[in-house]
Amino acid sequence: MTCREKILSNDYADLITDYVVAEELSGTSPIDFCFHGIDDGYGVANVRRSMFPPMSIGYYGYSAIPVLYGLMQTGEIVFDPENLAQTGSIRVQNPPLSLQGAGVVLGFIDTGIRYELDVFRREDGSSRIMALWDQTIQDGEPPDGFLYGTEYTRAQIDRALQTEEPTLLVPSADTNGHGTQMASVAAGSILDQGLTFRGAAPQTDIAVVKLKPAKQYLRDYYLVADGVPAYQENDVMEAVRYL
């Protein structure tokens, strides 16, 4: 199996570890694993589960087993400009400050984004999304320095938006809706002079990581119920490195 396949396979456990442990694994035959670094101190080892004991803090240590993260809020959010006004955002967006996020990049690590929506476009219809890394799509090229998922550039997204069916060219989708809602609240464009929609920073560029779902063995370990979204700590760490 390739390292990409091991990263994705439920037959391989993901362990957050340092380079010393990775070197020890390399010197142990016949351990079946891959290791890829996240920063100067830590990385992720993907080891065949059948060659190691079941998940336990006693054996692996607390920090090695990825924590799982869920969503704080689900369901449709109705736009209400009064809520935005209470934060003070509209006041600083208007003169004399005119602070709308120009020159800033906002990054979102979540369930993805519905990139085709008007709230993520400029007035000319082009995308405000400068990069989108979808960890769940494996038939494209991952970002430079990463081993899984597919990266879509602004140019690719803009080409897709010029077609009748954008998802044929950029098939990334936010089926949950949580990531789209968070990005729109923070960075949604001003539509109809703010009557239809207005985000807190409507002129920022946007970068997005769509997290892949947690592996089943970790869901079982943490007793996460079926159907409840859950995402792995190491995938979040990779997303932070990307952004």
Residue ranges and their predicted role:
Residues 1-105, 111-128:
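Autoinhibitory propeptides
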Residues 94-235:
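Subtilisin-like serine protease catalytic core
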